[in-house]
UniProtKB/Swiss-Prot annotation:
Binding site for 2-[(2R,5Z)-2-carboxy-4-methylthiazol-5(2H)-ylidene]ethyl phosphate: T144, I145, S146, G175, I195, T196
Assigned keywords, A-Z: Magnesium, Metal-binding, Thiamine biosynthesis, Transferase
Pfam families: TMP-TENI
Described function: Condenses 4-methyl-5-(beta-hydroxyethyl)thiazole monophosphate (THZ-P) and 2-methyl-4-amino-5-hydroxymethyl pyrimidine pyrophosphate (HMP-PP) to form thiamine monophosphate (TMP).
Taxonomic lineage: Bacteria, Bacillati, Bacillota, Bacilli, Lactobacillales
InterPro entries recorded: Aldolase_TIM, ThiamineP_synth_sf, ThiamineP_synth_TenI, TMP_synthase
Binding site for 4-amino-2-methyl-5-(diphosphooxymethyl)pyrimidine: Q42, F43, R44, D45, K46, D77, S117, K147
GO terms classed as biological process: thiamine biosynthetic process; thiamine diphosphate biosynthetic process
Annotated metabolic or biological route of this protein: Cofactor biosynthesis; thiamine diphosphate biosynthesis; thiamine phosphate from 4-amino-2-methyl-5-diphosphomethylpyrimidine and 4-methyl-5-(2-phosphoethyl)-thiazole: step 1/1
EC number(s) recorded for this UniProt protein: 2.5.1.3
SUPFAM superfamilies: Thiamin phosphate synthase (SSF51391)
Protein name, UniProt field: Thiamine-phosphate synthase
Class of the enzyme per the UniProt entry, highest EC level: transferase
Length: 217
């Protein structure tokens, strides 16, 4: 059974692929994050990942099953075929990935929600005109080490403008720390999407709780 999209799912949004947890099994890492209370998981296996397509599919099936048991949405990054094969709850695409209109058409009738990365006012304005986008990921809010080709930093002031411009909920991405959560929440963002904050965390339970609490209003 798929998880239906609602803005609260963006509060503590964990993003990871095998490349983000070297020396660890992503299944074990996700189990820990689910137990801590993440509200969404995006499978983003790319960049320096060494998995074959067959290994990626097998890993994705296991991660999808874990999310289903926890009733947490399983989102696939930038791969419509994989999202459909895994019966994902959502798919997230970037400005340079598959055209979002093509993605929306491909998942029509499959109860898969769609997220789009937008880092400028022009990109948000364009997204507002496209039916079928459920949320926007905006950033990087701060400098990030997790994405080598990241867009220029927008800061919380820039994020606030993007949130005000968007007709759909916005999740903040990039360089997020626990200390920055209050300032991000003040922009009106629905939540934060993080990699390093949790993969490098010394207290996953506390840090996940901090994310959920910051965006609980």
């Amino acid at each position: 059974m798929s998880v239906t999209f609602e803005p609260g799912l963006l509060r503590a949004y964990f993003v990871a692929g095998s490349q983000d947890v070297p020396g660890q099994d992503l299944r074990d890492v996700l189990a820990k994050m689910l137990a801590a209370g993440i509200t969404a998981f995006q499978f983003r296996d790319k960049a320096t990942s060494t998995l074959t397509p067959e290994q990626r599919l097998a890993l994705g099936r296991d991660l999808r099953a874990q999310c289903r048991v926890a009733n947490v949405p399983f989102i696939v990054d930038d791969d419509v075929e994989l999202a459909l094969a895994l019966d994902a709850d959502g798919i997230h695409v970037g400005q340079s990935d598959q055209r979002v209109q093509q993605v929306i058409q491909a998942v029509a009738g499959r109860n898969i929600f769609v997220g789009l990365s937008c880092s400028t006012m022009a990109e948000v304005t364009a997204a507002n005109a496209i039916a079928g986008i459920d949320y926007i990921g905006s950033g990087p809010i701060f400098p990030t080490i997790s994405k080598a080709d990241a867009d220029p930093v927008v800061g919380t002031a820039g994020l606030q403008k993007l949130v005000a411009q968007s007709r759909v909920p916005v999740v903040a991405i990039g360089g997020v720390t626990v200390d920055s959560l209050p300032a991000i929440a003040e922009t009106g963002a629905a939540g934060v999407a993080v990699i390093t904050l949790l993969t490098h965390s010394h207290d996953v339970d506390a840090d996940t709780a901090a994310m959920r609490q910051a965006f609980s209003k």
